Every structure is written in structure tokens, then in C-alpha cells.
């Protein structure tokens, strides 16, 4: 499955999260202490807060984009193609 099908998330951080998970797994296998440092760094309140903010705001943008596309589709079908 692709990243988008597997996670089924609306936010735009799906790919960066997948890359970060891959990097963490690789580093953790080779250098467990560095892996632990990365895991600890990911839990710093500033990083967690920033990540949550980005997820929340990009989710809003995704919803707005979906709504806009639905309106454009409806407009196209009614005004251009003449469907009611």
C-alpha cells in the first residue's frame, strides 16, 4: 500500500512522518544511543507543539481544498454541462 492509503490522514505530514520513521528505524538499528536521542528529541514540547500545530492547520487547508473542489465540480456540472 502507498503511504496515503496506509495512514488515511488528511494532513500533509504523511510523507515527512514516513521518512522520519524510516530514518529513525535505520539509525536505531545501527546506533541505539543516537536512536534514543532522536526519540527523546521528538518529544520535546516545542517540537510536539509545532508538529501538532502544522497537522491541525494543514488538515484545515485540506478540508477547504476538498470543499472548493466539490463546489467547482458542482459549478462545472450545472453551469457548463447543464446537469441539474
Curated annotation (Swiss-Prot):
The record's annotation in Pfam families points to: Apo-VLDL-II (PF05418)
Gene Ontology molecular-function annotations: enzyme inhibitor activity; nutrient reservoir activity
* ATP-binding recorded as keyword: no
Instruction: Give the record's GO CC terms.
Output: chylomicron; very-low-density lipoprotein particle
Keywords on this record?
Storage protein, VLDL
InterPro entries on file: Apo-VLDL-II (IPR008404)
| Keyword check for Cell membrane | no
GO terms of biological process kind = lipid metabolic process
Outline what the protein does: Protein component of the very low density lipoprotein (VLDL) of egg-laying females. Potent lipoprotein lipase inhibitor, preventing the loss of triglycerides from VLDL on their way from the liver to the growing oocytes.
Family designation: Belongs to the apovitellenin family.
The annotated subunit structure for this chain is: Monomer.
Record's protein name: Apovitellenin-1
What is the scientific name of the source organism? Dromaius novaehollandiae (Emu)
